[in-house]
């Protein structure tokens, strides 16, 4: 019989002998077997009782004799093997715990067996159980349990408790050091218990395994474990966060196995379970996680998130929430004091040349739009969309004229805008994201796309531009350290320029998964901003914090500059979002369609290296058209005058770092004035 406790059988030997010779003693033996034995040992002793109740006297005597010999043999062999150990007392207690674990068929069998074998093979005699930590399989917790057992043993037998050698050495140092008299002895530094980072791979795996019953023998396969753990982890267990790497969150399982928090069994299909130390870590994580969840701010996503989706997809940390509020809620405090309503919107704009059309929040929902070129790799084009769907956001994927991600107000009724003479069923919101991976950002700076994209973003009229920079490992050879530093300075300068000069919000993310989480949080927040509270409060108005108004396309066609009109309207009503229909926005932001002569001239000027958007604008103000610019050069006959024409003319307009230097002026003259290079 497997996992039979030998000591329990030895304890039953006298009563087994009595029951063999006296029939009246058998009921007492059966009652004690039922009360004092467990598991395989109980099954073994019960079978003896049943055989002794049989009528074959010869078989009964033979079985009892065999049991005596078997039990005595176990006792002698164990005693001999334990006596050869340098620490028989400690070994005996570990053996006792190992037998108990085998009887109950618990997960501690593996731990105690490893500790038993290490202690048995150790030739060193330990003065204190704490010294056993140097053995493989004996950690601080098991040594602490041995120490408590030794204290009980010494108290029971009237023996002095051995002193911990580490404490004794500290006391000795204190007594021999006369200069340090009066100073408290330094406490021995206890090893810190393992604490995985929040929403990391080990964190998710431990939480998933803790969903099993601690007192059962249950376990999980890899597929089951990944399915359970994924909602608790920010990284994917199946797809690497970096396309150039092969590591996923599943690689953290090796850490848990090394630290003996998880053990495996079964071959070839491995199954995973928590050890006793693993269960302690899991309980500590759950206590910490409960406090963390109480500090989170849930978003209202009832219309998009199904009931069986994890709650973690709807919760976001407080730090990220503050980051968003600092970015996109600058006008909320002023709005709370004024309480503007949709009814007063038309009255405030009666004297304006453009009359916006107020839109009720009940007519639309906020929809996330992704560019078709936003993919993880060429072979995994749907990764971003699928991950957003898992987080409760269903994006629409289409080709965008500008930006990589934007948000629109999508009407429930597709024909809603027709009564105002507009096409489509979507109005642009004032939020757009330009996503740049770090290597792509460096490339766009080098080839000029960086400035051209920012120029089109400004011309689109979108107020809140988010420049999202995704970290990426850009490797350089050791011999090319100077180039690496150059790229680092280039990126830092571009980020500073984007924030200070262009006034865009720069968001840096660690990887693609972090970017996806950011887009999901932004979508939830915008939905809260543009939707009325539900249920409405009886004391406060049930109006959203931001309202939406449509700028008719016909007014934009008559307006000399829709951007200046937008700026005027936004200054008068900062809490109102003024948007155009999506088709109109695409026409305005198109790279080639509906370009004015001014726009073409600006793009032509920016083709010269060193001419930024601001410098091109100032040049265009002095010489409105390409023809005027060329004629200005033709009127000058002296090559030196042509070379310095732009620099001299712009000297009083642009100062400081924005000033056009003589070198740049010569470059412009070579292109536009026919000056030989």
Swiss-Prot record:
SMART domains in alphabetical order: ERCC4
Record EC number: 3.1.22.-
Keywords of this entry: DNA damage, DNA recombination, DNA repair, Endonuclease, Hydrolase, Magnesium, Meiosis, Metal-binding, Nuclease, Nucleus
GO MF annotations, alphabetized: 3'-flap endonuclease activity; crossover junction DNA endonuclease activity; DNA binding; metal ion binding
Record's subcellular location: Nucleus
Names of required cofactors: Mg(2+)
Domain of life: Eukaryota
GO CC, alphabetical: Holliday junction resolvase complex; nucleus
Span of domain ERCC4: 367-473
Main location group: nucleus
Basic and acidic residues biased stretches: 156-177
Pfam family, one: ERCC4
Transmembrane segments: none
Gene Ontology biological process terms in this record: DNA catabolic process; double-strand break repair via break-induced replication; mitotic intra-S DNA damage checkpoint signaling; resolution of meiotic recombination intermediates
Region (Disordered): 156-196
Keyword Magnesium tagged: yes
First-tier enzyme category under EC: hydrolase
Chain's role: Interacts with eme1 to form a DNA structure-specific endonuclease with substrate preference for branched DNA structures with a 5'-end at the branch nick. Typical substrates include 3'-flap structures, D-loops, replication forks and nicked Holliday junctions. May be required in mitosis for the processing of stalled or collapsed replication fork intermediates. May be required in meiosis for the repair of meiosis-specific double strand breaks subsequent to single-end invasion (SEI).
Complex formation: Interacts with eme1.
Family: Belongs to the XPF family.
The protein's name in its UniProt record: Crossover junction endonuclease mus81
Species whose genome carries this gene: Emericella nidulans (strain FGSC A4 / ATCC 38163 / CBS 112.46 / NRRL 194 / M139) (Aspergillus nidulans)
């Amino acid at each position: 019989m497997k996992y039979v406790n030998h000591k329990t059988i030895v304890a039953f030997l006298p009563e087994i002998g009595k029951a063999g010779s006296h029939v009246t003693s058998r009921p007492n033996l059966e009652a004690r077997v039922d009360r004092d034995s467990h598991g395989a040992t109980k099954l073994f002793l019960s079978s003896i009782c049943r055989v002794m109740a049989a009528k074959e006297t010869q078989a009964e005597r033979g079985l009892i004799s065999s049991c005596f010999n078997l039990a005595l043999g176990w006792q002698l062999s164990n005693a001999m093997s334990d006596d050869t150990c340098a620490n028989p007392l400690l070994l005996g207690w570990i053996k006792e715990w190992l037998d108990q674990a085998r009887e109950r068929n618990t997960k501690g069998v593996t731990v105690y067996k490893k500790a038993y074998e290490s202690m048995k093979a150790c030739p060193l005699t330990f003065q204190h159980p704490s010294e056993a930590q140097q053995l493989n399989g004996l950690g601080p917790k098991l040594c602490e349990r041995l120490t408590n057992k030794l204290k009980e043993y010494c108290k029971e037998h009237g023996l002095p408790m051995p002193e911990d050698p580490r404490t004794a050495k500290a006391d000795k140092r204190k007594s021999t050091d006369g200069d340090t008299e009066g100073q408290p002895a330094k406490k021995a530094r206890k090893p810190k218990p393992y604490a995985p980072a929040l929403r990391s791979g080990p964190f998710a795996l431990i939480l998933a395994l803790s969903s099993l019953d601690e007192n059962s023998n249950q376990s999980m396969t890899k597929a089951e474990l990944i399915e359970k753990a994924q909602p608790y982890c920010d990284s994917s267990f199946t797809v690497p966060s970096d396309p150039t790497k092969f590591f996923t969150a599943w690689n953290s399982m090796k850490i848990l196995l090394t630290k003996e928090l998880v053990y495996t069994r079964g071959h070839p299909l491995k199954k995973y379970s928590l050890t006793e130390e693993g269960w302690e870590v899991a309980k500590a994580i759950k206590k910490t996680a409960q406090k963390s969840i109480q500090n989170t701010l849930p978003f209202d996503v009832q219309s998009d998130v199904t009931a069986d989706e994890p709650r973690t997809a709807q919760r976001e940390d407080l730090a990220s929430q503050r980051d968003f509020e600092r970015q996109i809620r600058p006008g909320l405090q002023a709005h709370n004091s004024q309480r503007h309503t949709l009814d007063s919107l038309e009255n405030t704009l009666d004297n304006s040349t453009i009359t916006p059309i107020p839109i009720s929040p009940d007519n639309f929902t906020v929809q996330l739009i992704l560019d078709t070129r936003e993919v993880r790799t060429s072979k995994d084009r749907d990764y971003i969309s699928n991950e957003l769907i898992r987080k409760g956001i269903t994006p629409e994927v289409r080709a965008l004229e500008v930006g990589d991600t934007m948000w629109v107000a999508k009407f429930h009724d597709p024909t809603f805008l027709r009564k105002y003479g507009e096409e489509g069923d979507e109005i642009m919101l004032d939020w757009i994201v330009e996503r740049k991976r770090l290597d792509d950002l460096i490339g766009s700076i080098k080839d000029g796309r960086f400035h051209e994209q920012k120029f089109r973003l400004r011309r689109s009229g979108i107020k809140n531009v988010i420049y999202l920079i995704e970290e990426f490992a850009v490797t350089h050879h050791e011999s090319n350290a100077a180039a690496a530093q150059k790229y680092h300075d280039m990126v830092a300068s571009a980020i500073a320029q984007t924030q200070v000069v262009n006034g865009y919000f720069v968001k840096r993310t660690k990887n693609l998964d972090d970017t996806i989480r950011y887009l999901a949080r932004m979508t939830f927040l915008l939905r809260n901003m543009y939707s009325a509270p539900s249920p409405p409060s009886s004391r406060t108005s049930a109006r959203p914090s931001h309202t939406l108004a449509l700028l008719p396309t016909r007014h934009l066609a008559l307006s000399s500059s829709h951007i200046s009109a937008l700026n005027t309207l936004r200054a008068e009503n900062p809490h109102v979002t003024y948007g155009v229909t999506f088709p109109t926005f695409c026409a305005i932001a198109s790279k080639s369609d509906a370009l004015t002569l001014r726009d073409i001239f600006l793009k032509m000027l920016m083709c010269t290296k060193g001419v930024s958007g601001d410098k091109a604008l100032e040049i265009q103000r002095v010489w409105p058209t390409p023809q005027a610019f060329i004629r200005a050069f033709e009127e000058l006959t002296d090559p030196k005058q042509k070379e310095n024409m732009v620099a001299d003319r712009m000297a009083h307009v642009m100062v400081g770092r924005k000033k056009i230097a003589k070198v740049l002026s010569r470059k412009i003259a070579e292109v536009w004035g026919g000056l030989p290079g």
